[in-house]
Amino acid sequence: MSHARDDHQGASQGSQWLSQARTLVQEGTLFNFIRCLLLFQGDSGQKEMTPGKKIPIFVDGVVLNGPQTDVKAGEKFVEEACRLIMEEVVLKATDVNEKVCEWQPPEQLRQLLDLEMRDTGESQDKLLKLCQDVIHFSVKTNHPRFFNQLYAGLDYYSLAARIITEALNPSIYTYEVSPVFLLVEEAVLKKMIECVGWKEGDGIFNPGGSVSNMCAMNLARYRHCPDIKEKGLSGLPRLILFTSAECHYSMKKAASFLGIGTQNVYFVETDGRGKMIPEDLEKQIWQARQEGAVPFLVCATSGTTVLGAFDPLDEIAEVCERHGLWLHVDASWGGSALVSRKHRRLLHGIHRADSVAWNPHKMLMAGIQCSALLVKDKSDLLKKCYSAKATYLFQQDKFYDVSYDTGDKSIQCSRRPDAFKFWMTWKALGTSGLEERVNRAFALSRYLVDEIKKREGFKLLMEPEYTNVCFWYIPPSLREMEEGPEFWRKLSLVAPAIKEKMMKKGSLMLGYQPHRGKVNFFRQVVISPQVSREDMDFLLDEIDSLGRDM
């Protein structure tokens, strides 16, 4: 009986297969029909399927048997791509003989790169060539002479962590899908909170300091008027926030995005070093109240973008406490000084803040992006402000402690495990190693300042407080000229012209900007431990070489 049943089942399956095959031929899908034949692996006289083989299943003309991806080819491609990364990125990261960039204008770069997406895929050899081109024409931010931004250098431990997370492709909103990375984030946040000086607190990692600042602004507003979450802006009084005239531009963006309005961002005057003046802050708070507006937030800055200035947090906290205002500290750039016993004094009083933004991807080289928003509150204010209680993610009847499902503390759903990069570096170096990294950056900046003072044609903007060294290069043609309007007009042209030359040569990258009435000057920032005294000397020598004939 069993043999008869098997024969009947085989005949039925064969009949089903023939019916599907006829349909494919009638529809003209010859390719799928051939695949069907190959998968069936039988002949017209075969009554039973080959042991271990399954007849092909079709849905809408698509064969569903087996994986579509060529696994072996994929593994080979990843292996070759990783070899390319090691040879062209990692091994060359500290080689000063390599160019920082291979500058090409957009029109020419488009011609050099094959950017078009086609109907058919490219060969693996072509893809590897594209990878090589991408590396070749990209700016080498790992290079010891890349000084253009507030990030630089290569941290090998962070890089390894990034490779792991890219391969695992996790998203951290619930413990069930990302158990390790949620516990890692919890551990890192706890340690960062200790660095700030709080006994306890809360926090979340965000995609950059701008988002952390915006989330802090929204959190402060929610604390002030919690009904806004459900009722929106209607019926709210005119809300005012105060920040330094030297603040990061993300403050204006956040006010615009949140519906507060950029006109309701009051910019507090700064002193000659770029620090917020607490007396002007208090004056503006009273002025806002006289206008019938409602102050709710003060945003101080620890480490301004251009000058590297640190606002006087203790004095600002006194003002905030008198007026009942939330104090947020944007320490995206300067927060890393907290790990240095010698330099953490720059952030004295930060423990009095209600929230802090801190980017380990800057001086601590955790890799972009790695930004934490730290909050002193422990009443679940983050979750109350941002939760949407999506029932498909945050079920309350799970078999584990759902307090580990932290996704409702964030404005995001999918969220990268950015804390893991910083955790790996911290585990590798220890707090003392991070401290040494910060102290070395300060020492190299001090060396550069001393060299600038010694050299003819270089002029400091001011003595730096952090590792931002701002200076002018004055070419020989201007050195005997009186410092009047014409002198400053001509000097304003020098930094952009030298920047163009260094970019086209590929020798180094250095930022410049005008700032609050001062004409274009260079801003040199030391971050990477791969940077040496010789690189500081080269920086000044190269600027002099490129600008001497101007």
UniProtKB/Swiss-Prot annotation:
Family note: Belongs to the group II decarboxylase family.
Names of required cofactors: pyridoxal 5'-phosphate
UniProt entry tagged with the keyword Lyase: yes
Catalysed reactions listed for this entry: L-aspartate + H(+) = beta-alanine + CO2; 3-sulfino-L-alanine + H(+) = hypotaurine + CO2; L-cysteate + H(+) = taurine + CO2
InterPro entries xref list: PyrdxlP-dep_de-COase, PyrdxlP-dep_Trfase, PyrdxlP-dep_Trfase_major, Pyridoxal-P_BS
The keyword Transcription belongs to this UniProt entry's keyword annotation: no
Activity regulation info: Activated weakly by 0.2-0.4 mM Li(+). Inhibited by bis-carboxymethyl-trithiocarbonate, ethylxanthogenacetic acid and 2,5-disulfoaniline.
Name the UniProt record assigns to this protein: Acidic amino acid decarboxylase GADL1
GO BP of this protein: carboxylic acid metabolic process
Role, per record: Catalyzes the decarboxylation of L-aspartate, 3-sulfino-L-alanine (cysteine sulfinic acid), and L-cysteate to beta-alanine, hypotaurine and taurine, respectively. The preferred substrate is L-aspartate. Does not exhibit any decarboxylation activity toward glutamate.
Gene name for this UniProt entry: Gadl1
Organism, scientific name: Mus musculus (Mouse)
Top EC class, one word: lyase
Modified residues (N6-(pyridoxal phosphate)lysine): K362
Alphabetized PROSITE patterns for the sequence: DDC_GAD_HDC_YDC
Keywords: Decarboxylase, Lyase, Pyridoxal phosphate
Tissue expr: Expressed in skeletal muscles and kidney (at protein level). Expressed in skeletal muscle and weakly in brain. Not expressed in liver or kidney. Expressed in brain, olfactory bulb, liver, muscle and kidney with the highest expression in olfactory bulb and almost not detected in liver (at protein level).
Molecular function in Gene Ontology: aspartate 1-decarboxylase activity; pyridoxal phosphate binding; sulfinoalanine decarboxylase activity
Signal sequence residues: none
Subunit and interaction comment: Homodimer.
Enzyme Commission designation: 4.1.1.11, 4.1.1.29
